[in-house]
A protein has these predicted regions:
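Non-catalytic substrate-recognition and accessory regions of acyl/acetyltransferase enzymes
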Residues: 1-134
């Protein structure tokens, strides 16, 4: 996985201040496998808790990031995996399609669009969400 030198500002809601993470591009199989494993354990815990409370759980709670990343690796000219890391942990994952979609409205008709196929915050981020993006 390639680390960008540019830092990514995110707002830490618990400390009420801006902190800086690292934008990662590409795949590090071992790192993503570990992240996927950790996220799945946390998702199962959240799912059980919400079921006992009679609540629904997020649609993405069944996602298998290992499978999604393997698919992205098969199409590297089309799909790119991004992650945001803070404090040694991946806080969010996203897969972007940068070839297949084009703008339909003027003045950008025909120009390529970045299409976010999948995006997820780490399930270990407590509610209310610990981090949020900056505008």
């Amino acid at each position: 996985m390639k680390k960008y030198e540019n830092i990514v500002p995110v707002f830490d809601n618990t400390r009420r201040k801006t902190v800086y993470g690292t934008l990662l591009e590409g795949t590090d199989d071992k790192r993503f496998a570990q992240t996927s494993f950790e996220w799945e354990i946390e998702r199962q815990r959240i799912r059980r808790k919400r079921q006992t409370q009679g609540l629904s759980f997020p649609e993405h709670s069944h996602w298998d990031w290992n499978q999604k990343i393997e698919n992205a690796k098969r199409y590297p000219d089309v799909l790119t995996v991004f992650a945001i890391e803070y404090n040694g942990q991946i806080q969010g994952l996203m897969i972007v399609d940068h070839v297949l979609f084009h703008a339909k409205l003027p003045p950008d008709s025909g120009y390529p669009l970045l299409y976010v196929r999948y995006i997820e915050n780490a399930p270990h981020i407590p509610f209310p969400n610990c981090f949020r993006g900056l505008d």
